[in-house]
Amino acid sequence: MSNRRDRIVCALLVLISILHPSPARGQAHQALSNEFIRAEFAGPHLAAMIDLRGGFTLHIGEEDFALTIGGQAIKGRTLTSVKTQRSGTTYIIEYRTIPYIVKVIYELRPGWHFLTKQLMIEPLSPVDYRVNEIQAFGAALQPAAQDELPLSARGSWGILYRYPKGTGSSRIPAFGAFLLYQNPFNLWAKDGQAMTASYAPEIDWKAAYGPYISDRFCIGLYPLSGTVFPARAIPEWTFIPDYAKYLAENPRIDMAEVDALVECVRAFLLYRPQKSIRVHVPWCENDYQIDVATSDGWEEFKRIIDRAVEVGCQYTLFTPANSELSSLKENRDAWGWENLLFFAMGQKIRKGEWNPDQGPIPPSLQRTLDYAKAKNIKLVSYSYPSLPFMQNPEWTKWAAGKVGGYNGPDMGLRSFQDWWVGKLVDFVEATGAGGYSFDHWWIAYDNASSRYAQWNGCRRILETLRQRLPDIFIDGRQQYMNFGPWTWLAGTYPHPSLTDEQPESFASFPDLHTDRVSANRQRFAAWTYRMQRFVPPEILPGFITHQTERSDAMKVMRRDRFRARDWDVLGWKFSVLSSIGTAPFNHVVDYIPARDPDEFRAFSEEDKRWFRDWLDWTDTNMALLKHTKPIIGPPMIGRVDGTAACSGDRGFVFLFNPNHRQLDAEFALNASIGMEKGSEFMIEELYPEKGRLLGSPSGGFWKMGERVVLSLRGNEALVLAIRPSDAAASRPVLFNVCGMAAVTGRKLELSQVEGEIGTAPEIQVLLPGNIRINALTINGTDVQFRQAGKLVTARVQFAGDLFASSQALWKYDPSFTGGLIRASFTIPHRILDQLRRRQQRWPVPYTEDDLIAPWLGSHRLLLYAHVAEPDDAKDVTMTLDGKSVQVRKAYNNIYGNNKRNFLGSYVDLSSLEPDRHHILEVMLPQLAAGRFQGLFFENIEPEYTREIVK
């Protein structure tokens, strides 16, 4: 364990044990206990753990430890304990073996659902040594586990055991236990009920470092909830026709297991934000193409800073080029970005030409620092630890002279760790930088220190940096994003998208709007981080909007000004809510409309305020959002997904339909979403129809345990607030529409009631007292109604022809396998009017090349053939009113350079006459049953009216 705070605690505990020893033999049985679990000991050995909530007992027989130091194997059972110390939260046993003192430290703090065990090694004389292997735990566990689930490959992150209730024959496990080391190198050996847990640090330890303290071994107990999800993320975006069948046939994880692991990680966080982090990442608008040494380039980047501030960001990476300070020809990294590092000073730092604690800041950099300070935004440095730093030959000795590219320092060496941290601190102090985005950090070289030592060095760098600069921003990317939650305790968050943000780096969800594609990937990443990597919301990364394409149609990565306009007018709000709903603490804001002057001017004050208000909302509700967790299931084709952030008798629910067809979301008002108490609730819509109350079919207010079933339009995000009902309300309560309600005598009057054009919702009103009404008017129109007790219901028809967002032309048929489809439709005049108004509000003069991207030019009326797992080798053809129409293929990487970015096929129907009957024929290729999702109109937003049809 390299956590400095824990080292200090352990050292103090050992000092107490020395000053206040107790006899090792003949002592009474010891126990550690808190409000959740009790650990019982037989002499110096752990004998049992008891879950005090459920009554489950895990019996632990022949518990032991072992370790290997300098090739010498030491087994705990062969040693005699010489001292023990019991405090309120710890139990320490000391053993002596030539030439070492070994201390075994058990700890159980208040609030923990787990016990930890560590080994501390102290040589009897000040000598250096090598720790080969740590086996902190070996035992025979009873009862026998009914089932087990390794975490990561071969259990390298830990293991889960499931146990039945009692001694019956139930096949449904009722209790669970997790066992893990706080590192990604767990090793397991089993022989019947006996098992050992170890890891092999193979790390050299100097006496000057102090005692060697092992990583904690954790054992947690918990009742299982019965709410299960896939234990591994469903590969993007594989079509699963029967989710229940898939769940039954594949490994599952219980939500209680996930929650227990998340709480274990949370207990050791070194960074606990009090407000949300808001950082802009301008390489997502290709800021590397900008040279801030030129006047035009500086003005362009100033727009980026200004816009980042306007949408509420506190930080922005600073990654444009500066030809006065660095050049491409001097780059020595594998990716060709070294000229952008450390505010363009990275090459000089590597070569020793500029030391941040000594050298002056160049004028062009000082100008940038001054501008950011005046705008009250902190600049974040993009930084690579794995570069050919030659200040000490020891660092790159492993590479045998082949340095540069991917070959950099050995992270297992303390000399480099200390030098690197010193440079990072000096740079912050010299420039006022807000923090770092670490990338190109290789910690798994084959010929250097052990992989554990390299990983441990990365962890030590991060923890030391956090200790020296407690408020620093730390964004962590390749490669340490792959090494699990114990790597990330000191950082702000790991990589926001699991891998690079470029469109080619991940499989695209089929959708014509890139921000929705990106949002679906973000929720997939958040699911993976929460459900497979057990990341608490405090350090879980969001991702807002997208990264624009860098390569042209010839597959050339452009370093000149290329695709500087790429704002997804109709997709960005879905992306904002997707990120907030899954990662409310870390708002990673990517592409913003700033580089292009036309986009910069067109982004309205209303949109800026909407953006800021939602980020502010997360700060206001942070106490509840700490409880954010998935509900319903993983993001996938053909299903709705969501999250809940609930505690006690209130909370929030975010629901997302990534599909184009309308689908239902279903969840229960109970512990599965975090609701712990209360009997009756109100559900209020926060988005899209702010202030609308959703009524229970059984009577307006919702009951504890009731199932909530809500229909979501295609591509819709729905945000709900749940709170205790106002059962004693003195005024009528209106449900399912926005408006006002009042009772005059025996007449119920609803005014300012709005509904989507062409819809027919059921309106509910819950009356106060025992009022019986004999008349109902809605917006001045008499309406028929029913009254049952206090509840009045009426179904009303709002005027106009229904033509909704993602308007469908074909009813989904799960048995359809391709072939000919015929459909007829009429486009209301109001739809073309809506498109014209949007073009007036967003008057960006797109080029023909711009419009290859289907998300640009949102004034166009597009018809999309939505296919799950689309294949661009299979053509779709269409005829309209008997004439062939051009069918275009859409790609999230725009030019089709990577086939996994194929989004599907569409036609542009912008030139059609309104209010005229049209006949469409579509010929689809042979498809697996159910993969064709339907035909949908794109770029339509809901429109509302107060006109009621009698």
Model-flagged regions — what are they?
Residues 300-325, 430-434:
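Catalytic domains of carbohydrate-active enzymes, especially glycoside hydrolases
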Residues 36, 106, 115-123, 650-657, ...:
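Short, well-ordered beta-strand segments enriched in hydrophobic/aromatic residues
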Residues 31-33, 96-98, 109-111, 124-137, ...:
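Beta-strand-rich recognition/accessory modules
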Residues 458-463, 467-692, 707-718, 773-775:
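Active-site-proximal substrate-binding groove within the catalytic cores of carbohydrate-active enzymes
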Residues 628-639, 648, 655-950:
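C-terminal beta-sandwich/jelly-roll accessory domains of carbohydrate-active enzymes
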Residues 28-40, 50-98, 102-203, 679-692, ...:
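Polysaccharide-binding surfaces and accessory modules of carbohydrate-active proteins
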Residues 282, 290-297, 337-370, 374-431, ...:
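Active-site-adjacent "subsite" loops/lids of carbohydrate-active enzymes
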Residues 10-20:
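Bacterial N-terminal signal peptides
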